[in-house]
Amino acid sequence: MTLFKDHKGVDKLFQGVQTRINARIRGLTEDQILGTAPALIAGEAVTAEMLLAPTLDPSNYTLERTTGQIHYRVRVMGDSSLMNYVPTKGDKLTPKGDKPTPPEGMALAEINSPNGWVEVSFRVAAGTSADDIEKEYRAWVSQTEEWLSWLRSDLADLQDKQISRITRELTRRQDAIRREQALFDQLEARRSAQGEQ
């Protein structure tokens, strides 16, 4: 899978997160809702369901060689499958080297997400030195880390919005439960008073 190519998937991904959070909140009992601050419940629910933003570990890599190419396999922490999605800020941009058939010296990066690695390959032309490849690798790391920072920003925004939304929803539910309980208590008091007459 080529990095940062899915322009629509991130919205679906975020909808999936929201669906899981909503299911978690719907499963709360009245006692849980009344017994805990809404912001605390919201924070715990969102944290439990949010995706872990990917980060590169550019110093943790292996090298391989095939005819005409040098391959770096770089360790990724977090959910590396998120690297498929275009961050909001990058919607109109294409990362350097992220082309199906790169020219000489350019990188072609692919995700090997089940194992938490990204593979980036550099074409080797006549006269290419180790310094040339390392320079391209550092440039690729820099650009990829910039895109990942945008993706992390998208995830942080989503998390903040979800916490705010759920806190408001739980506050409304707490108020509704308390109103219903007060109404019930009034009716129960009237019933008891009628029984004493």
Language model: regions and residue ranges:
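N-terminal "first-domain core" detector
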Residues: 1-64
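Acidic-enriched, low-complexity/disordered segments with a strong bias for Aspartate over Glutamate
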Residues: 6, 11, 31, 49, ...
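Short, Lys/Arg-enriched charge-dense amphipathic segments
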Residues: 54-75, 174, 178-188
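Intrinsically disordered, low-complexity regulatory segments enriched in Ser/Thr/Pro
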Residues: 63-150
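Mixed-charge (acidic/basic) macromolecular-recognition segments
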Residues: 114-197
